[in-house]
């Protein structure tokens, strides 16, 4: 039951943007997540200081360096892994 609550909470904080080219609102960062098909998520800037989110960023740096194919920050992990990590950051 706790997992379901954390997943529902993650959906409140993690906003999936429907307009891929739209600017992120103040206080949020747009990231592209997925292995083959990328989905755009908006995450709070406060996540940048969290060690588990930094681990995802390190994975991104290893794979892409600073040249991201989507034009924004791309995190190369399965979407469910991303949601699992970020749901714990609330």
UniProtKB/Swiss-Prot annotation:
Membrane topology value: Peripheral membrane protein
Domain of life: Eukaryota
Annotated compartments: Cell membrane
Coiled coil: none
Swiss-Prot/TrEMBL keywords: Auxin signaling pathway, Cell membrane, Developmental protein, Growth regulation, Membrane
Main location: membrane
Other known facts: Seedlings over-expressing SAUR19 display auxin-related phenotypes. These phenotypes include increased cell expansion, increased hypocotyl and leaf size, defective apical hook maintenance, altered tropic responses and increased basipetal auxin transport in hypocotyls.
Entry similarity comment: Belongs to the ARG7 family.
Protein name stated in the entry: Auxin-responsive protein SAUR19
Gene name linked to the record: SAUR19
């Amino acid at each position: 039951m706790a997992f379901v609550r954390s997943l529902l909470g993650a959906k409140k904080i993690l906003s999936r943007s429907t307009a891929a080219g739209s600017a992120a609102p103040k206080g949020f960062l747009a990231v592209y997540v997925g292995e083959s098909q990328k989905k755009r998520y908006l995450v709070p800037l406060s996540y940048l200081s969290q060690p588990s989110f930094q681990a995802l960023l390190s994975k991104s740096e290893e794979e892409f360096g600073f040249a991201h194919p989507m034009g924004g920050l791309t995190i190369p992990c399965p979407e469910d892994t991303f949601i699992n990590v970020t749901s714990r950051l609330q």
